[in-house]
UniProtKB/Swiss-Prot annotation:
Matching Pfam families: MinE
Name of this protein: Cell division topological specificity factor
Main function: Prevents the cell division inhibition by proteins MinC and MinD at internal division sites while permitting inhibition at polar sites. This ensures cell division at the proper site by restricting the formation of a division septum at the midpoint of the long axis of the cell.
Alphabetical UniProt keywords: Cell cycle, Cell division
Native organism: Shewanella woodyi (strain ATCC 51908 / MS32)
Cited InterPro entries: MinE, MinE_sf
Length: 86
């Protein structure tokens, strides 16, 4: 083992791994939106408005995704980060 091998790290920095995971999520999200029906953006906005009637949320904390599989089955996935109870 040389002195240079000692300073080289075989592990990727945690920030690089986190950035890679985030990029994969963004790419998957954009692919999902590309295949979404024309009414999807309006439906997403209306869902956010309904949630805002009951809970104060940041629209950026709402994720709506439409997934399709080979059996022509569509799944609407909704993830909302709700505020903590005060």
């Amino acid at each position: 083992m040389s002195l240079l091998d000692y300073f080289k790290s075989s592990k990727k920095p945690a920030t690089a791994v986190t950035a890679k995971e985030r990029l994969q999520i963004i790419v998957a999200h954009q692919r999902g939106e590309r295949d979404a029906p024309d009414y999807f953006p309006q439906m997403k906005q209306e869902i956010i408005e309904v949630i805002k009637k009951y809970v104060h949320i940041d629209p950026e904390q709402v994720s709506v995704q439409l997934d399709k599989n080979d059996n022509k089955l569509s799944v609407l996935e909704l993830n909302v980060t709700l505020p903590e109870k005060s």
